[in-house]
Amino acid sequence: LSGVDLRGKDLTGADLSGVDLRGKDLTGANLTGVDLSGKDLRGTILFRANLSGTDLRSTIHFTPDTSPDTHQVVQRQADGIGSIPISGTLASSYDLIEARTVPIDLDGSDADEPNQWTTVNAMTDSTSTKFSGSLEESTGWYRLELRFSMNGNLVNSISISPIGVGEVFIIAGQSNSANAGIQRQTPSDSRVSTWGKRGWQFASDPQPIASGEKGSPWPLLGDLLATRYDMPIGFISVGLGGTKVEQWLPRSTDKFDRIVMALNEVGPQGARALLWHQGESDVGIEKEKYILMLKELINASRIEAGWELPWGVARASDCLNKVSIVNAQQSVIDDDPLVFEGPNTDEMCGSEWRYDGVHFNENGLTEHARGWYNAITVLLQQIIKK
């Protein structure tokens, strides 16, 4: 298996008895029923690997249960510092776990000297197999290094790269918030990431949770923001085509669970804002009814988050002069100081912007991204002086 990329591979029941797995990256691999007993897994990366029924007796390994993940971006706070969560499961005895970051360039090469080692966890119970901690780090793009010691002796080490501290956005709504653009987009900046059920990854379309298989504005927006602020950008896009605002309410369907899933991934204060682009399917609804439902959704998301999550709301209908929806969206923006104006995509109608009258062509995706960029720039000017 030398040189074979095993990430995400289905290895169910495979005979790996003669395979040297030291240092292999098995991120997301299915190892169900694989006998790994007695194997040396030092340096082996088992992030989000399926280990159901896997025999790990007497192995030497490190398995982060939740994070950090490669390409993961954590939200910086107003002081530019973000908290990188670190957790894992140990199959061998350690009494000290330390971490440090190494600044890296866009190509992954070292950009500066490593930062100082910091204690993540001092194991007081030698029988414990799980640990958790965090590392406070300034805005940037890094390789995370972990080392494990016992009685003052280094016994294992591992590195995870890349990870970032920057800006994170949750995205919800209907098809124009999802993967309905005419062409898939790919970021030109390696610091633009997205999250899906298999973890964080480079943010090429299609976005992994949102509906559809085409393109979105988010890789383009990520490039704009990464260039403007010189930092990593993370997205979690959970949009679903054809949905009405009522369907996103927690009392209606399971659509709200998608927002909850994103909130659980980022954690408290873990996203700059939720970006909402929806309204095409609600043409004909009374203005006041739309206002009440969108406000209910925003409040429900904040209750679930446990903090005052900002929202960005686009002005969007079906391009047929249905001003009641746009006026309703504007009313929600005006009534809540933590809701900011997103782009008015009703200004982008016709074949110049949309390939089928509804969904964006290449020009439309570019302008949609530019609209969110302008809105977010205004938001960040109010929060962070840069």
Predicted feature residues:
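Cell-envelope and extracellular/periplasmic
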Residues: 62-386
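Tandem repeat scaffolds
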Residues: 1-63
